[in-house]
């Protein structure tokens, strides 16, 4: 947005706030025409941008002077010169999620720890409930 448009919008908000508070002010705002509506926000560079981007498209932004690169998937950098490592690439579909499945060995170790803990707790509770010393439980 241009600065003139923002200033007119701000002035209209102030005028509306005065009108809502009971201080009626009548004014007419000038018609705003935007000459840049015919120019797309982003357009391709053309022949002068051939070879500027190594792995992507050369573009011109309407509000910023200069050539910029829109990198292809898997590349990054000012001129798309760096390869993104496969481990760090984001999916093209933002709705996909990556799930990590633990190895069976880790699952077995965790289940074993849980079983040993449960058995130890049950023996501890049994000895507290019966209040028998461990030596008395052993038959000579």
Swiss-Prot record:
GO MF annotation terms: epidermal growth factor receptor binding; growth factor activity
* Residues carrying sugar: 34, 95
Segment forming the signal sequence = 1-18
- Which keywords accompany this UniProt record? Disulfide bond, Early protein, EGF-like domain, Glycoprotein, Growth factor, Host membrane, Host-virus interaction, Membrane, Secreted, Signal, Transmembrane, Transmembrane helix
Stretches of the chain found on the membrane's Extracellular side: 19-100
User: Cytoplasmic side of the membrane: what ranges?
Assistant: 122-140
Which residues are tagged with the site Cleavage (By host protease)? 96-97
> In this UniProt entry, which cysteines form S-S bonds?
45-58, 53-69, 71-80
Q: Where is the EGF-like domain?
A: 41-81
| Induction summary | Expressed in the early phase of the viral replicative cycle.
GO annotations under biological process? epidermal growth factor receptor signaling pathway; positive regulation of cell population proliferation; positive regulation of mitotic nuclear division
Question: What biological function has been recorded for the protein in this entry?
Answer: Stimulates cellular proliferation (hyperplasia)and mobility around infected cells to promote rapid and efficient spread of infection. This effect is beneficial for virus replication in vivo, because poxviruses replicate possibly better in proliferating cells than in quiescent cells. Acts by binding host EGFR, inducing its dimerization, autophosphorylation and leading to activation of several cellular pathways regulating cell proliferation or cell survival.
The record's family statement is: Belongs to the orthopoxvirus OPG019 family.
Q: What is this protein called?
A: Pro-vaccinia growth factor
């Amino acid at each position: 947005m241009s600065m003139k448009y923002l200033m007119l919008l701000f002035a209209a908000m102030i005028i509306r706030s005065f009108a809502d508070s009971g201080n009626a002010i009548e004014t007419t705002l000038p018609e705003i025409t935007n000459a840049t509506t015919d120019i797309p926000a982003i357009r391709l560079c053309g022949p002068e941008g051939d070879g500027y981007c190594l792995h992507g498209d050369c573009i011109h932004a309407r509000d910023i002077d200069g050539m910029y690169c829109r990198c292809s998937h898997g590349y990054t950098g000012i001129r798309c010169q760096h390869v993104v490592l496969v481990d760090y690439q984001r999916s093209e579909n933002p709705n996909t999620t990556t799930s990590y499945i633990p190895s069976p060995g880790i699952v077995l170790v965790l289940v074993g720890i849980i079983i040993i803990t449960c058995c130890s707790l049950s023996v501890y509770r049994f000895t507290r409930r019966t209040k028998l010393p461990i030596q008395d439980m052993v038959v000579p």
